[in-house]
Amino acid sequence: MVDGAGEAAGVNPLKTFDLATLGGVLRVCDIELVLLDGNGPRASVLSQVHDESLFLSATCGFQFRGRFMLPPDWCLLGFIHATDPERSWCHGLPLNAGMAVTVLPEGISEFSLSAGTQLSLLLTPMRRLQRKLTELTLRNSLPSGQTLSLFLGDTGTGATRLAQRYAQLPAWLDGTTQPLPEDAVERLLHEHVQALLASESQERPTCSRAR
C-alpha cells in the first residue's frame, strides 16, 4: 500500500495546487477532478513540451477521482511507478505499480488515484502512434474496439526496458541529469508499443468504459 502522508525519496516536494490548475495539466483537454480525502490538492508536477508532444511526471499527495476526453488527434501513454491498487482504478480495473497505460481518443476516460501515486505520461499526436504501429505490425490501430489498454510494463526483457525508460523521465524533466534527448518521443513510443504488442493476454486486462 502506498503511504500518501510522506514524500518518497527522490521525488520533488509536494506543492499545494488549485483544482483548476491540476485539471489543465494535459493542456489539450481538461480533467474533471473530485477530491476523495482531506489532504487537499497537493502534488509534484513536472512537464515539458518536446517534439510536438508533452512529457509529464507527477506524484499525488491526495486521493481523487477524475475524468477526461482526449481530442480526436491525440493519444496518451503512461506508466504507474507507485500506487495503492485498492484505491486506484481505471474503468473499474485496479491500477498496480508497474502497469503501463494506453488511452486512445474515443470516449470518456474515468479513473481514481490514491495518495502517493507516482506516474509518468506521454501525450503525443495520434498519427505518431499509428505510424509506430504500422512500422511494427503493418496495421495502424490496436485490436478492434480496444480504445484503452492496461498491461504489466515491468515484466520481460522489453517491458523492463520500458519501465527503465519511464523511470528516467522525472530526472530529465527536473534538469538534475541531462535534458530530454532529441529522439525521446520516438524512443518511448517504440518501447511502449513493443511492450504492448509483446505482452501476453493475461497481462492485458479487458477494459470497459464504466466503473
Regions found by a protein language model. Name each.
Residues 36-70:
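Conserved short histidine dyad/triad with adjacent acidic residue
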